[in-house]
C-alpha cells in the first residue's frame, strides 16, 4: 500500500531521507514516522509512502495499523533519537517489491483490514509488475553485457 511499484523501492537507501528503518522520532528524518510541530500543530508524518501511492489506500493502511495497535493495546517503543539508518536492530522497510509481496500475502493484519479478495488483487498486481520487469532487458544489462564480450 505504501510502495506499489518496482521503482518505489529505489528511494529506500541509507542517507536518502527516505526511511529504511521502522522507527519513530521527534523531527528525525531518518525515521519512518516523524513527530513534528508544537501544540495544536503537532502531527505525525509517515515518511514511507512515496508519490506513487494511492493516497486513499495509504490512509486506509495507516488507519488499519492504528486500530490494530489500539485494539491490541500494543505499547509504543521508546522514541528513537539517533540516525535510524545505522540502527541494525530496527525492523526495516522491504527493499524490493518482491520482498513486500511476501510480507503482504503473509500479513494477517492486511487480511483482517482489507479482506482476502483485496489482498489477492494487490498481490496479483505485484506479480504482473514483477513478471513484466523480469522479462525486460534494461540498458544497464545491455551495456554490462557488451562490456564483458
Predicted segment positions?
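Active-site capping/gating regions of soluble enzymes
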Residues: 1-80, 84-87
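Acidic, glycine-enriched catalytic cores built around paired aspartates
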Residues: 84-149
Amino acid at each position: 500500500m505504501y510502495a506499489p511499484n518496482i521503482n518505489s523501492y529505489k528511494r529506500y537507501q541509507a542517507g536518502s531521507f527516505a526511511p529504511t528503518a521502522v522507527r519513530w522520532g521527534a523531527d528525525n528524518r531518518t525515521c519512518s514516522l516523524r513527530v513534528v510541530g508544537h501544540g495544536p500543530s503537532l502531527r505525525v508524518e509517515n515518511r514511507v509512502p512515496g508519490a506513487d501511492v494511492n493516497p486513499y489506500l495509504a490512509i486506509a493502511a495507516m488507519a488499519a495499523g492504528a486500530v490494530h495497535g489500539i485494539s491490541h493495546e500494543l505499547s509504543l517503543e521508546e522514541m528513537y533519537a539517533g540516525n535510524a539508518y545505522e540502527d541494525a536492530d530496527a525492523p526495516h522497510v522491504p527493499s524490493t517489491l518482491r520482498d513486500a509481496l511476501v510480507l503482504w500475502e503473509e500479513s494477517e493484519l492486511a487480511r483482517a483490514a482489507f479482506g482476502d479478495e483485496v489482498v489477492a488483487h494487490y498481490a496479483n498486481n505485484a506479480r504482473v509488475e514483477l513478471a513484466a520487469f523480469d522479462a525486460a532487458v534494461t540498458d544497464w544489462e545491455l551495456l554490462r553485457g557488451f562490456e564483458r564480450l
